[in-house]
Every structure is written in structure tokens, then in C-alpha cells.
């Protein structure tokens, strides 16, 4: 049975009335893309609830693809984030009034986690369909980065793998005007929609090709389970 694609966005923050990631995510509500139903969830912009909310969503939705979207004012194109770091450092308060300075996302967690998106395929598909986009090697140290870090941690032992990524999106034109359009690029909602639709259309066939091989790997792993932290004896 086909699983779902989970797409998330964030509510407005910092006094803004809209958030481009929320607008983009909501535009996909109820859609069927490449045979997969798209499930949409909007997150409060609060650092303390990210882990708990994603943990709950993964159980409720049971997706095999998760795309978290986050607004990144100042960017001029869609940005796929390659890496999330175990750092929380931001001075713009979240919607609970919280800031972070030199903190970590997860105590004892890995320094960084790498997204398993097929980056080159997606960017090539974007460019072929006229969507400006690129791969970013820095998701920052705010809540967007935290989202990707938490998601990768929550899904790292899933078999078959859950394909997980963070998409940073620019301001919408109205936001850029309010912020001072001479120094704040923007992108139309229609172009953002084309971008995330193309992203999903590119990922789903790739996921379906990977699933049989991932299942074989999982079955092979059951033949000899080695607890984490225990090395196999050299032969």
C-alpha cells in the first residue's frame, strides 16, 4: 500500500501576518501527487515543541517521504538543505518568546546529520521545469535547522528508510514589499508550488525503486543483529 507524503510548514513569527512556508504547505492539502496523498501539518514556531510534534506526526501519518518547509527571507530561490547541525543559536524570539545562544538540539547527539534526498535529481528536475533552486550546505542554526536535525534523528532507524528533507523557501512578493523589496527577493506562490510538486514527483519513483532493495537489506540485517556500539569480530 502506498504511503503518504508529509509536508510541513510554520506559522507566522516575528510579528509577520503570513509565513511563506505555511502558505506553500497549505496549497498542497488534499492533493494526490504521483499516486501519493499529501498530508499537511502546520507547526507552531516554537523550539521546545519541535521534537514532540514530529514524533507524533510520524506515528499518525506513517509517511515514507517527509518534506519540511521553512521560510528564509533573503533567499532568491528554493534551497534544499543537505546538512543539519546540532546547534541552536538564534536571537529572534520564537512564538513562545524563547531565544537560544550556543545551545544544542540534542544533548549527546551527532554533531551533524545528512539528509537522504536525491539532491542532483531534484535540482535537475527543477531547472528543466524552470524553477530556480539549489543545494545549500548550511541550514543555519535556528528552528529550520532544528526541524531537519530532529526529523533525521527520529527516522534514522526506519526500514525501509524515510526520505527526509528541509526546503527553505523565499518570501512571497507581498512579504518582500513589506520588508523592503529593494533588498529582499521573493518568489510567487505558483512557482513555489511548481517547485515542491516537481520535488515530490521526482522523489516518489526514486523511493519506489529503493524500497525492494531496502527490504532485502532489512531482511539480511535480521540474520545477524549487532547492537549499536558493538563491533563485529574481525575475521
Predicted regions and their residues:
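N-terminal catalytic or cofactor-binding beta/alpha core of small enzyme domains
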Residues: 1-141, 152-161, 181-234
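Active-site glycine-rich loop that binds ribose-phosphate moieties when present
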Residues: 144, 148-150
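Short active-site-adjacent structural elements
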Residues: 15, 144, 172-179
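An accessory alpha-helical subdomain
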Residues: 164-174
Amino acid at each position: 500500500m502506498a504511503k503518504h507524503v508529509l509536508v510541513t510548514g510554520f506559522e507566522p513569527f516575528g510579528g509577520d501576518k503570513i509565513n511563506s512556508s505555511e502558505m506553500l504547505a497549505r496549497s498542497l492539502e488534499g492533493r494526490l501527487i504521483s499516486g501519493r496523498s499529501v498530508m499537511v501539518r502546520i507547526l507552531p514556531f516554537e523550539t521546545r515543541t519541535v521534537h514532540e510534534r514530529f514524533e507524533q506526526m510520524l506515528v499518525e501519518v506513517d509517511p515514507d517521504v517527509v518534506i519540511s518547509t521553512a521560510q528564509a527571507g533573503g533567499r532568491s530561490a528554493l534551497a534544499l538543505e543537505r546538512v543539519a547541525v546540532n546547534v541552536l543559536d538564534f536571537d529572534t524570539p520564537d512564538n513562545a518568546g524563547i531565544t537560544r545562544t550556543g545551545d544544542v538540539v540534542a544533548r549527546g547527539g551527532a554533531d551533524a546529520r545528512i539528509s537522504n534526498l536525491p539532491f542532483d535529481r531534484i535540482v535537475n528536475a527543477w531547472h528543466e521545469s524552470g524553477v530556480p533552486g539549489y543545494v545549500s550546505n548550511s541550514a543555519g542554526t535556528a528552528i529550520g535547522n532544528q526541524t531537519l536535525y530532529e526529523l533525521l534523528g527520529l527516522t534514522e532507524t526506519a526500514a525501509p528508510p524515510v526520505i527526509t528533507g528541509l526546503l527553505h523557501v523565499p518570501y512571497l512578493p507581498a512579504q518582500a514589499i513589506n520588508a523592503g523589496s529593494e533588498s529582499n527577493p521573493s518568489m510567487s506562490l505558483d512557482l513555489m508550488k511548481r517547485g515542491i510538486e516537481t520535488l515530490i514527483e521526482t522523489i516518489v519513483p526514486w523511493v519506489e525503486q529503493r524500497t525492494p532493495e531496502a527490504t532485502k537489506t532489512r531482511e539480511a540485517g535480521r540474520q545477524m543483529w549487532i547492537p549499536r556500539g558493538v563491533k563485529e569480530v574481525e575475521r
